[in-house]
Amino acid sequence: MTNLKTSMIDTMTEKIVIGQKHTSELTVTNAVTAIAMGSGDMPVLATPAMMALMENAAMLAIAEALPEGCTSVGGHIESSHLRPSKIGDKISAIAEVTKIDGKKVEFKVAAYSGETLLGEGTHLRFIVDKERFMSKLG
């Protein structure tokens, strides 16, 4: 049974490689400000919005490498928000695979406005079978 389980996990991650990257982008609008998201009272990019963009980049970095019926879910994110961004700024989040351990995939993530680093951190995703994952919700 253990060998079958290991084989299934290996199949889930066999096409994911260290260094695999994706960049996700957004323009700061009122909808993603700290005011709108309830994380602050300033009209600047909300930290949760920056982290969501980083998570999106990580998810998309490996999405096409996953077998049919599988997806990845976020398990942990740690980040520092270093600089503010105003409405109208164009933000890019880059996620790069740094480690693969069974069904766990770790990423280095960073967000930029042009060449300016806005935030950086790490993110962990788990590869799951969609149907099995949803069945656990009861």
Spans of model-derived segments:
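N-terminal amphipathic/basic-hydrophobic helices that include classical n-h-c signal peptides
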Residues: 1-11
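Catalytic strand-loop segment that frames the active site of acyl-thioester-processing enzymes
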Residues: 11-45
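C-terminal binding/interaction regions
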Residues: 15-23, 100-107, 113-136
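Non-catalytic surface loops within mature trypsin-like serine protease
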Residues: 28-30, 83, 127-129
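A short mixed-secondary-structure module that forms the rim of ligand-binding clefts
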Residues: 46-50
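Hydrophobic beta-strand-centered segment that forms part of the acyl-chain substrate-binding groove
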Residues: 59-92
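Hydrophobic beta-sheet segments that form the core/acyl-binding groove
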Residues: 79-114
